Amino acid sequence: MTDLSTPQRAGSHKLPAGRRLRFVTAAALFDGHDASINIMRRILQASGVEVIHLGHNRSVDEVATAALHEDADGVAVSSYQGGHNEYFRYLVDLLRARGGERIKVFGGGGGVIVPEEIAGLERYGVEKIYSPQDGQRLGLQGMIDDMIARCAEGARAAAATGESQVGAWAAEFSEHGLPRFDSRDDVGVDRQGAVARNPSSEASRVAAAGRGDHLDRGVRAASTADTADTANTANTANTANTGSVADAADAADAADAADAADAASTASTASTASTASTASTAGIPDPASLVFRRLAQLISAFETAAIDVNTRDKLSALAEVTAIPLLGITGTGGAGKSSLTDELIRRFRLDYGDALTIAVLAIDPSRRKSGGALLGDRIRMNAIGDWGGGARVYMRSMATREASSEISDSLPDALMLCKAAGFDLIVVETSGIGQGNAAIVPFVDESLYVMTPEFGAASQLEKIDMLDFASFVAINKFDRKGARDALRDVAKQVQRNRADFAKSPEAMPVFGTIASRFNDDGVTALYRHVAEALRKHGLRSGGGRLAAPEDLRFSSGRNAIVPPARVRYLADIAQTIHAYRERADAQARLARERWQLIEARRMLVETGEAARSTVATSASPGASASSKANACTSTSSKANASPGANTTANSNASATSGTATPTDALNPTLSQLDTLITQRTASLGERERILLDTWPEIVAAYSGTEHIVRVRDREIRTALTVATLSGSEVRKVSLPKFVDHGEILRWLMLDNLPGYFPFTAGVFPFRRENEDPTRMFAGEGDPQRTNRRFKLLSEGMPAKRLSTAFDSVTLYGEEPHERPDIYGKVGNSGVSVATLDDMKTLYDGFDLCAPETSVSMTINGPAPTILAMFFNVAIDQQIARTTQRQGRPLTEDELAATRRTALENVRGTVQADILKEDQGQNTCIFSTEFSLKVMGDIQAYFVEHGVRNFYSVSISGYHIAEAGANPISQLAYTLANGFTYVEAYLARGMSIDDFAPNLSFFFSNGMDPEYTVLGRVARRIWAVAMRERYGANERSQKLKYHVQTSGRSLHAQEIDFNDIRTTLQALIAIYDNCNSLHTNAFDEAITTPTEESVRRAVAIQLIINREWGLAKNQNPNQGSFVIEELTDLVEEAVLAEFDRLTERGGVLGAMETGYQRGRIQDESMLYEHRKHDGSYPIVGVNTFLSAHPHEAPQPIALARSTDDEKQSQLQRLRAFQAQHRDAAPAALERLKRAVIDDENVFAVLMDVVRVCSLGQITHALFEVGGQYRRNM
């Protein structure tokens, strides 16, 4: 039997009795790369650690606040987006300033954080930055063990000194009282008073330190460019409190003279990057924040029984002085308790004007085997932060530990301490419960039970204890099937349980809610009743700021993104593809049998068995067919040129028509053959007969030296051969040599030539001779710098194919700011664009409406705003050109005509794929529902204004792959997302052929074999589904896609080897006829690529396209046995994944449960484990290692934005805002009203971007569209 009594922890580090290590994990601000940190938090949990995971895109303030309020031992942050020097320094500073000196900071960023920067950050105070070499040396578990050991040592040291201090605080507070919140006198009026009440307390000392120079110096140092990595010596030990040159000289004892000199330089110049307001707001803790920190430490002390009984009794008595209402929220696992809790807190804050102070105690289960716990409620909370008036919400995540129920044994003490602190409201959220659990009820005044509609038969409700005790019941996820019936059944059960038959079931406190929907009226109705009930238990009167909803108890209906009747669309598509393949096999069999019959008849005639026939075979329609077949098959070349389709073409006048001559009637064998031929011909489909009929013509067209197509009395000639130096003629398109009509037809139906349905080999018959598919990604610094890079990349190119990389600040819809964790990322890893003026500068000198100009913009969350800016630039360019040409101002009609012409001609792509952002890349900023609504608005605008040459979305698998997905998952999820957009746009009433041509795709090419056929499978599935299921035209059937070589396959070790990997990935992309291609620079593993490394990356493509011999042929993959086998294997695997997604409610239903994200994380972990144990060989990383690994690597030039560029952006932003300060407020109100009234938001954005900056627009949309809620 298995002993479950004690945890079997992986870590054997000795800790004080009852002590558990607690870690906060997160990805840095404006960083969606959370694959690594997710792996780390999983291993931490399995190693016995309690993990509070915050997810991606977390500011320093959010991480520091969580660490302090959760009383964490360590913080682990991944940073792959640059700005790490500022981020980690600022984090160390904030923790020190707010009383978290003992909290150890760990970090990692692959090769992005170079050794010199690692050394600098560790000298500054970061406990450890793990490098790729550390990972190689220690392995994943080894790195985790090292983190645990370092924190365990700190915990033991703290136990020797810190717990006695906490005990002293507890004793002091038990005598004099905790600094209580006095919300009745308006919290925040006297920010210093609460501290002054206990002048001898540690809180006073920390506040004094925060008001001094320490944090201001830290902000200044952290706000320099990344080149300040060696300036860290200015903060060694207790030196550098003023940031002066003298401080740097003092620091020379801890570092070399060069470091000190750099520190002095930094200290003298960095002040331009900080402001006094930054230091005061971020560094000086407000009184509530100080109370929260001490409260967190006291809760931990009570958990370890470090507080004596006498002190506890005094605190308990103190807690009972004031009646403080307690709300308990419990329910089944996965019911959405955390989201609903957050939405209720949001409504309390809004309704009371943010005057309430609220404590949230969230409990999650511990794992018995390891003792670890994933405390995952905080990641879901959007409404607990500082709204500008100081801290109002304290949250503590608790593990059940040895408790046998859904609550922690420490909950009573935690509630007592929260009461003693004087919160206005305390909310307790339990872990998931079963039918027989109701442990929360005795601890709270009012309880809320959260469930979903999927509870089974109505009889199951009789077994649920909480339906007896709950004050309120919320049926969350009310948009699911059967929700109305569930509401009725639960209400009746509650009525029976209460024996309250004087009221109707509809009057029972049972509510239907959709917590995932922003501003859901069902949640608001629930809030109204909960707040009213809590007022009876001491909740202060007030509120009334929220509009009262109609008298309802459930969420009102809205149009579903994908209508319920269409929710099985992916399974239907899979069935369509399978049916098409079955048809191809069946039709090929018929064609083969028919051809065999014709051949048999021909051979019978030729051998003389029908020699007695006196009628010449040429007079016989059947013989005519046979002779034609004979002519087609007499030589292999002739057989290839004519598959016997002539028989089909003449089937009504030949033997295949079933008409027999008198002579044939005398020959039973020939007559029977004719009958069989007629039957097979009749069974062939019309499309299939046409394919066989036209094949000889196609063969003839491709057999010469030129391919000639006539379009509107104009001939387009394409050379069909390329001569080699040896004199060989290499055909641009090679044809199969099949003779068997079945093989020909099967190949035509499943493969076919490039440019022919199902477009497996490519969507165009030939590549453009004068235009390589090169599209290089560029973006760095300010718009002027990137504009220069664009001109460099496109120099000498007949086509200007620009691909724009935005910095992470822009990617998250924000704008430049002096705050260090923002400032460090401005212009790094992309270009900073905050205003319409920035966009004009970025594309200055390029005619955006010229046929040879195409612009791709890689941006998603704020894509509608950025696209509106881009379209305005294109329109303004054309208006300026037309005005100059006319020599006068344009009339209103001329302006309108010019705008329409610009929109009709502008070419390019905006990524704007919000589904893959939720699943992989994580630059979602708005609620998913709102983002999808605005995507539909963009497409509707395209249809209305005739935008035909611009792609409204680039449905992207690249970022799914970069997050860790294998190639099959990348392809399956990407195609599934594409079909989801199709269903969503159809549901809005758009025609398939109006919007399908505006959809494009974006894939990664890696090293696995499946990448070789990614494009083939994608094109075939899309084409067949578009034609067979949606009835789309040929233009809509063509899937066009961009390829970027794998960033994940670039390694910081043996960095020069990266170009070899990129070359192979580019080769298979070109072989597969991708429509455009980006080749990564070899140094992207550690930095934004330099001009030289980008030139090398471009050269990879040019060498393949212009030098590589086999690339002269444009369908080299066709005819390969392994390519065909892989194509079928990958297609079948994708369709199987479609079925799995369907089982989970389609793409949106699967996203709700985190299915795609979970699969991606599992696949990422498999890759990481196999990379680290060497079973997945990577040359230069885990095999073929250098014989001299410790030699200093050749220094790589690090591309970083400069201080001048950052300051320039700040100045440009403020100048734009000052210029439009009068018009901006009205424009923002107009935008918000458009959202509320369900207008086309993008159409309004086209006007708003002319007077409002990106950050202003983003925050206005947050108010009415909601913020994205992170998933685990």
Curated annotation (Swiss-Prot):
Q: Where is the B12-binding domain?
A: 20-158
Q: Where is the composition biased (Low complexity)?
A: 221-240, 614-631, 639-663
* Residues annotated to bind adenosylcob(III)alamin: 33
Enumerate the residues binding substrate. 766, 801, 907, 951, 1000, 1035, 1040
Top-level taxon: Bacteria
Pfam families reported for this sequence? B12-binding (PF02310), MeaB (PF03308), MM_CoA_mutase (PF01642)
Q: For Mg(2+) 1, which residues are the binding ones?
A: 338, 377, 429
Q: Do the record's keywords include Electron transport?
A: no
Q: Which portions of the sequence form the region Linker?
A: 537-758
Region (GTPase chaperone MeaI) residue ranges read: 163-536
Q: Name one GO molecular function term.
A: pivalyl-CoA mutase activity
Reactions it catalyzes:
2-methylpropanoyl-CoA = butanoyl-CoA; GTP + H2O = GDP + phosphate + H(+)
State the EC number(s): 5.4.99.13, 3.6.5.-
Q: Does the keyword Isomerase apply?
A: yes
Reported cofactor(s): adenosylcob(III)alamin; Mg(2+)
Q: Which InterPro entries match?
A: Cbl-dep_enz_cat (IPR016176), Cobalamin-bd (IPR006158), Cobalamin-bd_sf (IPR036724), GTPase/Isobutyryl-CoA_mutase (IPR052040), IcmF (IPR033669), MeMalonylCoA_mutase_a/b_cat (IPR006099), MMCoA_mutase_a_cat (IPR006098), P-loop_NTPase (IPR027417)
Its subunit composition reads: Homodimer.
Fill in the domain comment: Is composed of four functional domains: the N-terminal 5'-deoxyadenosylcobalamin binding region that is homologous to the small subunit of ICM (IcmB), a middle P-loop GTPase domain (MeaI) that likely acts as a chaperone for ICM, a structured linker region involved in dimer formation, and a C-terminal part that is homologous to the large substrate-binding subunit of ICM (IcmA).
Q: Which family, according to UniProt?
A: Belongs to the IcmF family.
Entry function: Catalyzes the reversible interconversion of isobutyryl-CoA and n-butyryl-CoA, using radical chemistry. Also exhibits GTPase activity, associated with its G-protein domain (MeaI) that functions as a chaperone that assists cofactor delivery and proper holo-enzyme assembly. Does not exhibit methylmalonyl-CoA mutase (MCM) activity.
* Annotated protein name in UniProt: Fused isobutyryl-CoA mutase
Q: Which organism is it from?
A: Paraburkholderia xenovorans (strain LB400)
**Organism placement in taxonomy:** Bacteria, Pseudomonadati, Pseudomonadota, Betaproteobacteria, Burkholderiales
